[in-house]
């Protein structure tokens, strides 16, 4: 597969750059969430940052070296509140899965690069999940439901692992004394 001079080559580089920048932005957003007392949201930004790194690596591997010239625009320079960051992240993810990667996949298909088209399409599926998760977190923060729910649940301390039952997380962990920010709804997914 020789991409040299193709639009697919440019699209791969744009996707690589975009994913790399999203990864870094998400690490900044994770720090902000932690400062605001949202340990789980911070961890979700960090997890998503790792996903973006892997997406960047997939696009990078397709390129196979060389120099590619292109002009592109990327969001820069703003770290807002956790809610603002979640909204910005959701918008970026929506652009990727809703427009960018489907279009890039179509171009790759038309130019005879079905493997690259498949990569764009499967990564788009992940980005759709990221957008849904970010939007759900915005809703949870805005409704004051990060640490308080309408039903009885189990809450797990992310620091020491204590699991307690209640409609809201304790103000502090009775075991390790870490603040409420370290609690998340406990889910057994194994």
Map each language-model feature to its residues:
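Non-heme di-metal
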Residues: 1-190
């Amino acid at each position: 597969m020789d991409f040299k001079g193709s639009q697919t080559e440019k699209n791969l580089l744009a996707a690589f750059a975009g994913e790399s920048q999203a990864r870094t932005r998400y690490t900044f957003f994770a720090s902000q969430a932690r400062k605001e007392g949202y340990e789980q949201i911070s961890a979700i930004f960090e997890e998503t940052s790792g996903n973006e790194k892997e997406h960047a690596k997939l696009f990078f591997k397709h390129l196979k070296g060389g120099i590619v010239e292109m002009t592109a625009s990327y969001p820069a320079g703003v770290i807002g509140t956790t809610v603002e960051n979640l909204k910005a992240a959701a918008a970026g993810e929506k652009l990727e899965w809703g427009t960018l990667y489907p279009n890039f996949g179509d171009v790759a298909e038309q130019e005879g690069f079905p493997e690259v088209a498949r990569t764009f399409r499967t990564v788009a599926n992940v980005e759709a999940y990221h957008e849904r998760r970010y939007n759900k977190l915005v809703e949870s923060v805005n409704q004051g439901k990060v640490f308080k729910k309408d039903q009885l649940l189990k809450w797990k301390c992310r620091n020491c692992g204590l699991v307690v039952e209640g409609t809201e997380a304790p103000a502090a962990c009775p075991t390790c004394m870490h603040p409420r920010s370290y609690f998340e709804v406990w889910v057994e997914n194994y």
